Amino acid sequence: MSKVAVIGAGIIGVCTAHFLRKNGHQVTLYDQNEPGTQTSFGNAGLFASHECVTANSPHLWKNLPNMLFNKNGPLVIDWFYVFTHLPWAIRFLRNCTSARAEHIAKSLSAFSCQAGLAYEEIFDDVDVLNNIVHKEPIFLYESKKLFEQNQYAFNLRKKYDVQFVVINKEEIAKIEPSLEPIYYNGVVLKGESFTNSPLEITQKIFNNFIKNDGHFIKIKIKSIVQKDNSLFLKYEEKEQQFDKIVVAAGVWSNMLARTIGDNFPLDTERGYHIVFENNNNLLTHPVGWAKTGFYMTPMKDGIRVAGTVEIAGLKKPMNKNMLSMIEKTARKILPQLGKVKSEWMGFRPTLPDSLPVIGESKKCKNVYYAFGHQHLGLSLAAITGKVIQSLIEKKNTNINIDALNPYRF
């Protein structure tokens, strides 16, 4: 079997390392941070394994003016940043047609159809019983108008067998009585579940990997080097040789890809969360709020309100206005929320078509990419790891990943 390096110890990299190690490969995982403590740490905790609708919608054009100038909406844009990154923005908008939205939904559906099964394989080896909650998410709409504006997304989900049920105000109140009844109706995403600690999920998979002879080196990788058909990782003043290398470094992946001649239109959607004290067990299900694009999820450490999108790159500091909007809106929906325990911002890796990059480099044989999962990193981590394992072993994946290939741009 091969000597493999996996760069990136978020949920994608850890799941990939798990499958490769389990199949007999000698695997070393690299990250400059502790496993699971970066982007994977801060998500809303949903296993949205059947989600196929992304931000690339033909209806975005109609709503764009309002979205762009609404500082209390689900999308906030730093105009200076966007103007300096116009090629990415133009590519994104080109993917906001009916034909492209259909293609993206079909591609995600084909890839995610075995996401749950891939996680089951991991969870057969890793005890996460206390971290998985089988309560279906509820997504709430403030008004009939807002609900009707989302019919296109509902129809697309129906086409690709995403199961959901529309429930009325009275039904919502029975399920989650602590919610202020300021909603019009809601949608229950059937068959989905969530984790009460994304960090613990990643750490438990990582600990199992280490327990079974996996290796972890906490260090920043500077570059990938190819010499005489051999592959090396360069860090500090050292080089380490490997047979195969997997780049699963999230939004930082392109920095490594460039060192071997690849270049991807990878950018970031900055996401935020606030954790509130949950003294009275206010929620039993994840509850989404369509108007602001966040979920309120009951977790071990409190109620985490996570989501929103800010287009502002990697360098700008945390936007306190985003946090203020999240807190104000969350308290309006759930008035009994306790004190703020913590605030967080992370960087979702995003490509213009909202699809991940999964496949082998053409510039450098035996280098594989697994990044760009934007809002679905937790949901698609296990199936991504499974597919990368199959690609490395030259096995049939039984999943059509043509739309995810690294050279589609």
Where are these regions (language model features)?
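N-terminal Rossmann-like FAD-binding beta1-loop-alpha1 element of flavoenzymes
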Residues: 3-28
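Glycine-rich FAD pyrophosphate-binding loop
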Residues: 22-41
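Active-site substrate-recognition segment that forms the wall
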Residues: 45-47, 51, 55-95, 223-226, ...
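Rossmann-like flavin
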Residues: 86-204
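Flavin (FAD/FMN) cofactor-binding core of flavoprotein oxidoreductases
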Residues: 140-144, 158, 170-175, 268-269, ...
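A conserved short coil-to-beta-strand element within the FAD-binding core of flavoproteins
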Residues: 167-171, 175, 217-231
